Amino acid sequence: MDNSFLLVVVGMCVVIVAVVALGYYQKQKRMEEMRALAARQGYRYTERDDALAGALAEFALLSRGHSRRATNVLSTEADGIAATVADYQYITGYGKNQHTHRRSVLLLESGQLDLPAFVLRPEGIGQKLAGLLGQQDIDFDSQPDFSDAYLLQSPDEARIRSLFGHEKLAFFARRPGLCVESQGRRVLYYRSNRRLSPEDIPSFIEDGLAILLLLAGERAAAPTGEPDGLAGLDAVLADLSVDEVAV
C-alpha cells in the first residue's frame, strides 16, 4: 500500500475523531452550564424532552424538517403562567444535503389566555410559510413600519385587527426580528436562529413574558401569589414595562 495513501487515511480518521470529540465536549459543556443556570434560578432542568419536541413541531414556525429534538429544557410556573425554554433542533434535507438547525425557543402557556391564532415573523423570510399556511399577510395602513418589518398571518383577520391596536403595532415595529406564534392558550417566542448563551436565558424569558402581557392586554399588575421558580416572577411581571424590553 502506498504510504502517502495510508497517511491520507490516517489523517482523515484523526480529523473525524477530533470533530466528534469536539462536538461531544461542546454538548457536555452546554448541559453543565444549563444545569448550573437552573440551580441558580430555581428552574427545573430536563436533558431531553421528546414530548415537548412534538408539541413545538405543532407550531407553524417550527414545523419544518425532521429529526426534531428539544434538549436542555428549563421550565417553571408561577401565577398561572408556565414558561419552558429549550434548545430546539431539527434537520432539513438528507445525506450530504442535510443541514442541522438550532435555536433557543420559549413556550408560554396559561389557561387564562384566549388569544386568536396567528403567526408573526420578520418580513422577507416568511414567504415559504405563507404558502404553507395558505393565508395572506395582514397589513396595517396606519402602521407602515410594522407592515414593512413583519409578516402577520391568521385564519381570523377580524380578530387580529382588533387585537393588534396602535400600541402593539408600535411595539413590534420598534423591535424588528421577533418571531411569535399564538395557539390560543399557548404562545411561542424566539428572536434568532441560534442558541442563546445561558446568561441570556433569564432576560429572554422576561422579554417573552412582557410580550405575552402586551398581547393579553396587561401592562402592570400581575396576579398575587408566591412565585415558584422565576425568582420573583410576580414582581417581575408587576414592574416590567413592555417599552423596556431589550431585543
Regions found by a protein language model. Give the residues of each.
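Transmembrane-cytosolic junction motif
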Residues: V17-Q41
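Charged, low-complexity intrinsically disordered regions
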Residues: E32-A55, A60-V247
